[in-house]
Swiss-Prot record:
This is Dihydropyridine-sensitive L-type skeletal muscle calcium channel subunit alpha-1. Belongs to the calcium channel alpha-1 subunit (TC 1.A.1.11) family. Residues 1418-1453 form the EF-hand domain. Residues 1-70, 128-139, 196-214, 352-447, 502-509, 558-576, 676-815, 871-882, 928-946, 1082-1134, 1189-1196, 1272-1290, 1403-1852 are cytoplasmic. Keywords: Calcium, Calcium channel, Calcium transport, Disulfide bond, Glycoprotein, Ion channel, Ion transport, Membrane, Metal-binding, Phosphoprotein, Repeat, Transmembrane, Transmembrane helix, Transport, Voltage-gated channel. It comes from Cyprinus carpio (Common carp). IV repeats lie at residues 1121-1405.
């Protein structure tokens, strides 16, 4: 037995082992198979390759084996890597020189080429070349390989030919060999095809190119428009500069000042240096590259400006050339639209696409893992079951018993052998060990220990931060000692934790591993220092690792800990992106070396630091372009290296543009996507932990209250939840949801009068609410609650009932008083801006001083009044208890103090004057919307705390490392030849270029760099400027040149040190700064959703519902006059649109041909073409005016825009012609012969007239903007643009206030600094006037050279000659506060406000990357446009029959699309279920709302009436001001027996169903059965239950399957189903009968005239037999039709009397088919109604008090049957069948049951009375049984999926 069981067990184990081996083998084979498939692109190998090699060919077999051999792949990757190294080592030299290394590398190139060619050949033989799936060239990466190999071979062939022909190799015999060899740099791209993770990133980038197409188009379009505007405005303006008279030497004041344009007259820069003149002949700024002389250069300049790099230089040059009156408008709008909006669109689209792609790949990975786990579980489960059955378990249990006995005997013998005392001590030691570990564990977990560790960390930080340049020896030794002590503390902490938790548990935590690493490195550092093994540099870097201990702080701060953890996790996701970024940089660096290597050597200029002379330098240069800092200057050098702007060298700008666009716009924005992803993850982590902590607290509470009753416990839990919601409520007021900043969040977009939406008249609390959703601004401004007089007395004099106090109360709370105070605040703000900062004694300042007294008096009176009313500060509710009132008090107090002190030189008075700038802040307390925004911003700043802290920690760490590396090493002597401070004394001679005086004497000075690392604070400031990408190359090159402490720089001394800066930029600038943007976006989205978290609608649903509720129909003017109609028809046709589009494009090309110094022929041609286009566009305007008349024409904003452009263009043409005619007399403004008086004046006047004429020439350019209206994609982007600005009113106001305050402070503090050319405070950039100050701040906000502005504003700068400085105080202007001033402004602007703008754009641009099949607000405008064609007068109603055709003209997801069958359309209408008016019309809002509701599945499930009520409640809660009338229109309330489209079209489906039922009967019997028995009724009832009900059910719930419907419709067409007469539309005359009226004419009256042609086309598209059409009823020609549609009662009676004729007309009607359009277009559509406008559908009756009948009157009671009579038994059976089908609500509708009864009777060919008798018999037989039987399963046709209808479903 034992052996048997043992054998069984062994057999089971062996079987399990063999099974696992088989499984492993199977998996291995599957992997190999998958790899082979991947190698061939997922396709099987072709049977033949190159038409010759079959699969069995031994040579091909060998090729396949080699290619699919893993080492082969590794060899190729290594070869690519080696090739990259060879390319990097290559040293390009000027003038095509070379050296031995380069020659060796050239010969190595042949080896690489042979290897790559061989690989290519083997793969082509293995997989075939091109003509079948899986061929070599069918894979994109292989195409890249093939091109690279081909170009290499081609280069080799050309080289060989040249060598044979004796042509020098490099000249290439006509071929540019350098260009061909440049293809070699693409070889690193082959690494992408070898690394799968790179392929994923690359593929997702390529995939995201699609949504970027429209944005790229918009960017190009915007650049083109601004370029042509620049061409018109600034052409030929930048070629004059100041020359010394009689020479070609350009005059500049300082050696470092760049030459600038000048103006001979007018407002431009004058030449002020003695002996200089302003004349033409200068190539222009940047070697003649930056100008607007032709469209290409203008586009390059505009592109450079929208990258915000050197845009102010271009603006200042234009100002110098033309004056600074208006060019700033051009550049500011360019930056706002181009840089802040359009480039952020790129960011939004990219990040959305990447997030989507990452989400998809994550989902795919999770799904794959789940499948594998399920498969493994299934295999294991099956096999374990098999083993369990095979094994005999008893044997195992016996074996275990034997084993236990053996163990016991062994332990007994052990006890006997060992001494008892040893055992005792061993046990005692173990016990003590357990006790000590437990105590140690408690100690380590205690708060005291945590605080001790934190204290040690902070001390460690302080010791490191104390280090600085020129520190004392004592401090150094103290730091060394402290380091050892602190290291010992950290070592003790580590050992204690390791002992308390055990090594395994200790190393489970990532933070503990991190601690261990830091401590180990610290110990290693001390050992190396003591033993003098390592260099000091290495030691200093290792010391900095101690700084990582700072992150120990985060473990005690949960949310910060989670943030750090998520950032560490994101390193994995960043790795592949960084690899791609590195590959991208390497490729462009290698390409740059090929194109620019050794060419950046210009004889007349200093050495260019950013160059491509070697690989490390090329990498740095490419990285610099990638960050966007001074990328334009590198581009200019590249252009000059290839011959300058006049040669084809200008084409190298393409290299830099592609590098900038791909690197900066695309790759760097992916960091943002990753940042947003990981932030969301950190947020969810924190939320989950919060939830966990609350749960723990709740459990603890319950445990502490065991004796309390259940009710008390519930009450306590409720209180806990309330306290939680309050705690959470306050932070969530950080509503970065910008809708909150609108004048009203939900009503702002309503363009209609508010009469339709009466507001709820409740009083609104104006203070910030505690609830998660702040009140909308309009609500806050509707009515302010008046604060009553407090019970306490004020000033101990005025009691609560005192008359004076009551009077003051009335005054203070009066609206007029508030408005007056706001007006005075505005006036005082204007007076502050109008002050002259230079001369305090100027007349203007004296006048403003008196005004200041008036303002101060008014504000003082206001405060006194308020204190009188509310009391000063002693009691609750008093004036000083409000923080905003304290602000008011401070501002007024400051004004009073500054009035009392006279001298402006006293620093206290200066400060007090500066503090007056806070006056505008007083407006915040009065404008409630603005107050709310400010409060939200403060809370938002609190929420960013964690990110700021992490960034500051990192910045601090890098600053400490910087101090270790660079302290005292960035000093230099002004004489570059001297290297130490001792040598740097005395004077030296300096040659001045471009000067008449060749040599100048300068004083030697030993100076420090402006941004240095001498201490931690300086280091943090330097690093912060680097993180903003401003001026970092300058700091980098100073660091590279740094030598030793207190020693001057050596050129390229430490190139490797650049790694420090690059790592810092990647970690901080690329990643952490994007985290800021990401955090604002995440907070914005989270808070936006938070406010609606309980309303059950997501954001998209809310936007669409809001649109549907607020939209109003558009008026569509259609002329009555036939001639005018023809013009209108032509103007509204698409051909006219295409013609105008073509003309605008032609006009664009014609505008682009202009250039500076163009010939007279070009000028004449340009003017002639302009005249022609002006005539054409004037013609367009006239034609449109004829078509639409003035009212209709000017109703469209685009037409108004056209009109302005045409008028401006006509003025332009007239002025140009007049000016040309008067040219001989000096032009337009010199009619009185000013040329004779003063030639310079003539030039000035001529320039002025050019400006005037040029202004009107702008109208030519503005025509291009009309193109924006032509493209759907660009229209959508414009929609985003408008939406973004719509969301910014109060935020915009906040930005204006911020700029105003900072501008006025800047004027007071830096206004006296002298304007010195060559510095950053100069004639174009200063604080001397308010507009200049605002422009300077705007420059700082864009980040343009802002660190240099700080340096130019620091204390010790030269004062302006007009200012009131004393003797010897010439250099006392500026202020040390400049650092704080500019830093705070830059941080507020760049990181908060501009990011807020980015967040809004990203929120509005999400539709670009969203699934296009999801309905969004941008789809809904189309509905309004097409509705207008059916309802030109904008009545808001159309016939319900028009709805089908209207919706078929709108493409999905909003409409049905033109290919949607009518039957499917009718079923969609059932689910839409709009209320139907008595005249057969539906309303605009109800239809749009129903479309939105069904498309987005808003409350369409479950009981329909209940869903309606829930939706009504949601709408009331979100859109409180929606009128009840509108709400009843879109969602009828319960209890109203409304006629709805759903009920109406439900009868269609019942009728269609019975027609099919009859057809089946005919097919079954071959004829209409005459046998009448109960089985027939049962069959009909069964068909209702099993066929009609499920179909209706699906239609009601909107669960339609389009393909299924299409198939059924086609089947119906093939079976030849004919439309039977009778029905729902009442009496219709045959449209093809011999009636004199034409269907065409009637259509023209009932429908938009444009549609009378299109209707027939739709009929052709949808074959009549395949489409479900309404049934029509025909009568003999001699039957008179009813014309009095106004008397519907008679009409019903008349119809009832004719009911008997129906069967007679059956056979005749069944032989004809009529289209839906024929019916709705026929003149007899409503029973012969003569007036279409007054007609009523015959399907409706006038409502009476007795009854209303919603359906066709012919289904109503006949003459012999009163309205109250019925067929109870039949009705009962039909109701039962409907209920069994899940249509309870239809079963309750007597009218619907009546319709169904009649249809059933007709279908089984039986009279009503007979059917009732049989039905009664069925009911009698069923009596005593359960009435509601179990539903039978619905038979499903083969090959289709069964859709089981839900129980208890909704009503229609």
């Amino acid at each position: 037995m034992e052996s048997g069981s043992g054998g069984g067990g062994g057999g089971g184990v062996a079987a399990l082992a063999s099974f696992i081996m088989n499984e492993e083998e199977l998996k291995r084979k599957q992997r190999e198979k998958l790899k082979k498939l991947q190698a061939t692109g997922g396709n099987p190998r072709p049977p033949r390759s190159l038409f010759f090699f079959t699969l069995k060919n031994p040579f091909r077999k060998t090729c396949i084996n080699i290619v699919e051999w893993k080492p082969f792949e590794i060899i190729i990757l290594l070869t690519i890597f080696a090739n990259c190294v060879a390319l990097a080592v290559f040293l390009p030299m000027p003038e095509e020189d070379t050296n031995n290394t380069n020659l060796t590398l050239e010969s190595l190139e042949y080896i690489f080429l042979v290897i790559f060619t061989l690989e290519c050949f083997l793969k082509i033989v293995a997989y075939g070349l091109l003509f079948h799936e899986g061929a070599y060239l069918r894979n994109c990466w292989n195409i890249l390989d093939f091109v690279i190999v081909f170009m290499g071979l081609f280069t080799l062939v050309v080289d060989t030919i040249n060598t044979i022909a004796g042509v020098p190799t490099e000249k290439g015999g006509g071929f540019d060999m350098k260009a061909l060899r440049a293809f070699r740099v693409l070889r690193p791209l082959r690494l992408v095809s070898g690394v799968p993770s790179l392929q994923v990133v690359m593929s997702s980038i390529l995939k995201s190119m699609l949504p970027l197409f429209h944005i790229a188009l918009l960017v190009f379009f915007m650049v083109h428009i601004y370029a042509i505007m620049g061409l018109e405005l600034f052409k030929c303006k930048m070629h004059k500069t100041c020359y010394y008279q009689g020479t070609n030497i350009i005059a500049v004041r300082e050696g470092n000042e760049k030459p600038s344009p000048c103006a001979q007259a007018g407002h431009g820069r004058r030449c002020t240096i003695n002996g200089t003149e302003c004349r033409a002949g200068w190539p222009g700024p940047n070697f003649g590259i930056t100008h607007f002389d032709n469209s290409c250069f203008a586009m390059l300049t505009v592109f450079q400006c929208i990258t915000t790099e050197s845009w102010t230089d271009v603006l200042y040059w234009i100002n110098d050339a033309m004056g600074n009156d208006w060019p700033w408008i051009y550049f500011l709008t360019l930056i706002l639209v181009g840089s802040f909006f359009i480039l952020n669109l790129v960011l939004g689209a990219l990040s959305g696409e990447f997030t989507k792609e990452r989400e998809e790949s994550r989902s795919r990975g999770e799904y794959q893992k789940l499948r594998e786990r399920q498969q493994m579980d299934e295999d294991l489960e099956g096999y374990m079951e098999w083993i369990t059955h095979a094994e005999v378990m008893d044997g195992d249990s016996e074996a275990l018993l034997l084993l236990r006995k053996d163990t016991d005997s062994e332990s007994d013998s052990l006890y006997q052998m060992l001494d008892q005392q040893v055992i005792y001590f061993y046990r005692l030691a173990r016990r003590w060990n357990v006790v000590l570990r437990r105590k140690c564990h408690v100690w380590v977990k205690s708060k005291f220990f945590n605080w001790w560790v934190l204290l040690v960390v902070l001390l460690n930080t302080l010791v490191i931060a104390m280090e600085h340049h020129n520190q004392t020896e004592g401090l150094t030794s103290f730091q060394d000692t402290a380091n050892v002590i602190l290291l010992a503390c950290f070592t003790i902490e580590m050992v204690m934790k390791m002992y308390a938790f055990g090594p395994r548990a200790y190393f489970m935590s990532i933070f503990n591993r991190f601690d261990c690493f830091v401590v180990t490195i610290g110990i290693l550092e001390i050992i190396l220092v003591v033993s003098n093994i390592m260099t000091p540099l290495g030691i200093s870097v290792m010391r900095c690792i101690r700084l990582l201990r700072l992150f120990k702080l985060t473990r005690y701060w949960t949310s910060l800990n989670n943030l750090v953890a998520s950032l560490l996790n994101s390193v994995k996701s960043i790795a592949s992106l960084l690899l791609l970024l590195f590959l991208f940089i390497v490729i462009f660096a290698l390409l740059g070396m090929q194109v620019f290597g050794g060419k950046f050597n210009f004889p007349d200029r200093v050495i260019q630091r950013s160059n491509f002379d070697n690989f490390p330098q090329a990498l740095i240069s490419v990285f610099q372009v990638l960050t966007g800092e001074e990328w334009d200057s590198i581009m200019y050098n590249g252009i000059m290296a290839h011959g300058g702007p006049q040669s084809p060298g200008i084409l190298v700008s393409i290299y830099f543009i592609i590098l900038y666009v791909c690197g900066n716009f695309v790759l760097l924005n992916v960091f943002l996507a990753i940042a947003v992803d990981n932030l969301a993850e950190a947020e969810s982590l924190t939320a989950a932990q919060k939830e966990k902590a609350e749960e723990k607290a709740r459990r603890k509470l319950m445990r502490t209250l065991p004796e309390k009753s259940e009710e008390e416990k519930a009450l306590m839990a409720k209180r806990l939840m309330e306290s939680r919601s309050k705690a959470e409520g306050m932070p969530t007021t950080a509503k970065l949801k910008i809708d909150e900043f609108e004048s009203n969040v939900n009503e702002v977009k309503d363009p209609f009068p508010p009469a339709d939406f009466p507001g709820d008249h409740e009083e609104v609390e104006p203070e910030i609410p505690i609830s998660p959703r702040p009140r909308p601004m309009a609500d806050l401004q509707l009515k302010e609650t008046v604060v009553p007089i407090a019970e306490a007395s004020s000033f101990f004099i005025f009691g609560p009932q005192h008359k004076f106090r009551k009077l003051c109360h009335r005054i203070v709370n009066h609206t007029t008083f508030t408005n007056i105070i706001l007006l005075f605040i505005l006036l005082s703000s204007i007076s502050l801006a109008a002050e002259d900062p230079i001369d305090p004694r100027s007349f203007r300042n004296k006048v403003l001083a008196y005004a200041d007294i008036v303002f101060t008096t008014v504000f003082t009176i206001e405060i006194v009044l308020k204190m009188t009313v509310y009391g000063a500060f002693l009691h609750t509710g008093s004036f000083c208890r409000n923080s905003f009132n304290i602000l008011d008090l401070i501002v007024v107090g400051v004004s009073l103090l500054s009035m009392g002190m006279e001298s402006s030189t006293i620093s206290v008075v200066k400060i007090l004057r500066v503090l007056r700038v806070l006056r505008p802040l007083r407006a915040i307390n009065r404008a409630k919307g603005l107050k709310h925004v400010v409060q939200c911003m403060f809370v938002a700043i609190k929420t960013i705390g964690n990110i700021v802290l992490v960034t500051m920690l990192l910045d601090f760490m890098f600053a400490c490392i910087g101090v270790q590396l660079f302290k005292g090493k960035l000093y230099y002597c002004t004489d570059p030849l001297q290297k130490t401070a001792e040598e740097c004394q005395g004077t030296f001679l300096k040659h001045v270029p471009n000067s008449l005086h060749d040599i100048e004497v300068h004083q030697r000075m030993w100076v420090n760099s402006d941004f240095n690392f001498d201490n931690v604070l300086n280091g943090m400031l330097a690093l912060f400027t680097i993180s903003t990408f401003e001026g970092w190359p300058e700091i980098l090159y100073k660091a590279i040149d740094s030598n030793a402490v207190d020693t001057g720089p050596l050129y390229n001394n430490r190139v490797g040190i650049s790694i420090f800066f690059i790592i810092y930029i990647i970690i901080i600038a690329f990643f952490m700064m994007n985290i800021f943007v990401g955090f604002v976006i995440v907070t914005f989205q989270k808070q936006g959703e938070q406010e609606y978290k309980d309303c059950e609608l997501d954001k998209n649903q809310r936007q669409c519902v809001q649109y549907a509720l607020k939209a109003r129909p558009l008026k569509c003017y259609i002329p009555k006059n036939p001639h005018q109609y023809r013009v209108w028809y032509f103007v509204t046709s698409c051909y006219f649109e295409y013609l105008m589009f073509f003309l605008i494009m032609l006009n664009t090309l014609c505008l682009g041909i202009q250039h500076c110094n163009q010939s007279d022929h070009i000028t004449k041609l340009s003017d002639t073409l302009n005249l022609i286009f002006t005539v054409l566009f004037t013609g367009e305007m006239i034609v449109k005016l004829i078509a639409f008349k003035a009212k209709g024409y000017f109703g469209d904003p685009w037409n108004v825009f056209d009109f302005i452009i045409v008028v401006g263009s006509i003025v332009d043409v007239v002025l140009s012609e007049v000016d040309a005619a008067l040219e001989a007399r000096g032009g337009l403004w010199c009619l009185h012969g000013c040329a004779e008086v003063n030639p310079m004046q003539a030039i000035a006047e001529a320039e002025n007239v050019r400006v005037s004429i040029t202004f009107f020439r702008l109208f030519r350019v503005l025509r291009l903007i009309k193109l924006l209206n032509r493209s759907e994609g660009i229209r959508n982007l414009l929609w985003t643009f408008i939406k973004s600005f719509q969301a910014l009113p109060h935020v915009g106001l906040l930005i204006v206030m911020l700029f105003f305050i900072y501008a006025v402070i800047g004027m007071q503090m830096f206004g006296k600094v002298a304007l010195v050319d060559g510095t950053e405070i100069n004639r174009n950039n200063n604080f001397q006037t308010f507009p200049q100050a605002v422009l300077l701040l705007f420059r700082v906000a864009t980040g343009e050279q802002w660190p240099k502005v700080i340096l130019a504003s620091m204390y010790g700068k030269l004062c302006d000659a007009k200012s009131d400085y004393g003797p010897g105080e010439e250099y006392t202007c500026g202020s040390s506060i400049a650092v704080f001033y500019f830093l705070s402004f830059y941080i507020l602007c760049a990181f908060l406000i501009i990011n807020l703008f980015v967040a809004i754009i990203m929120d509005n641009v999400d539709y670009l990357t969203r699934d296009w099949s999801i309905l969004g607000p941008h789809h809904l405008d189309e509905f309004k446009k097409i509705w207008a064609e059916y309802d030109p007068e904008a009545t808001g109603r159309i016939k319900h029959l028009d709805v089908v055709t209207l919706l078929r003209r709108i493409q999905p997801p909003l409409g049905f699309g033109k290919f949607c069958p009518h039957r499917s359309a009718c079923k969609r209408l059932i689910s839409m279920n709009m209320p139907l008016n008595s005249d057969g019309t539906v309303t605009f809002n109800a239809t749009l709302f129903a479309l939105v509701r069904t498309a987005l599945k808003i409350k369409t499930e479950g009981n329909f009436e209940q869903a309606n009520e829930e939706l009504r409640a949601i709408i009331k809660s979100i859109w409180k001001r929606t009128s009840m009338k509108l709400l009843d229109q879109v969602i009828p309330p319960i209890g109203e027996d409304e006629v709805t489209v759903g009920k109406f079209y439900a009868t269609f489906l019942i009728q269609e169903h019975f027609r099919k039922f009859m057809q089946r009967q005919e097919e079954y019997y071959g004829y209409r059965p005459t046998k009448k028995n109960a089985d027939e009724i049962k069959a009909g009832l069964r068909s209702i239950e099993e066929e009609a009900a499920p179909e209706l059910h699906r239609a009601i719930s909107g669960d339609l399957i389009a393909e299924d419907d299409m198939e059924r419709a086609l089947e119906a067409g093939e079976e030849g189903i004919y439309r039977r007469t009778g029905g729902l539309f009442g009496l219709h005359t045959d449209p093809f009968s011999s009636e004199p009226s034409s269907p065409l004419s009637t259509q023209m009256t009932s429908q938009r005239p444009l549609q009378f042609v299109e209707t027939r086309l739709e009929d052709i598209e949808s074959p009549p037999d395949s489409v479900f059409l309404p049934n029509t009823e025909f009568f003999p020609d001699n039957m008179p039709t009813t014309t009095n549609t106004n008397n519907n009662a008679n009409f019903v009676e008349d119809m009832s009397s004719r009911f008997t004729f129906e069967n007679e007309s059956l056979s005749a009607a069944a032989t004809r088919n009529y289209s839906y359009e024929d019916i709705r277009g026929s003149s007899s559509y409503v029973g012969g109604a003569s007036s279409v406008d007054d007609r009523r559908l015959s399907d409706f009756t006038v409502r009476t008090n007795i009854t209303q009948f919603p359906y066709n009157p012919s289904y109503g009671p006949s003459k012999n049957q009163t309205a109250t009579e019925a067929s109870p038994a039949t009705d009962k059976l039909i109701q039962q069948a409907l209920r069994d089908g899940g249509l309870d609500s239809l079963a309750e509708d007597p009218k619907f049951v009546s319709v169904t009864r009649k249809e059933l009777a007709e279908a089984i060919n039986i009279g009503m009375e007979d059917m009732e008798g049989m039905a009664q018999g069925i009911v009698n037989r069923q009596s005593g049984k359960v009435t509601k039987r179990k539903r039978r399963p619905i038979p499903v046709p083969p090959g289709t999926k069964s859709t089981k209808p839900k129980e208890n479903t909704s009503a229609v």
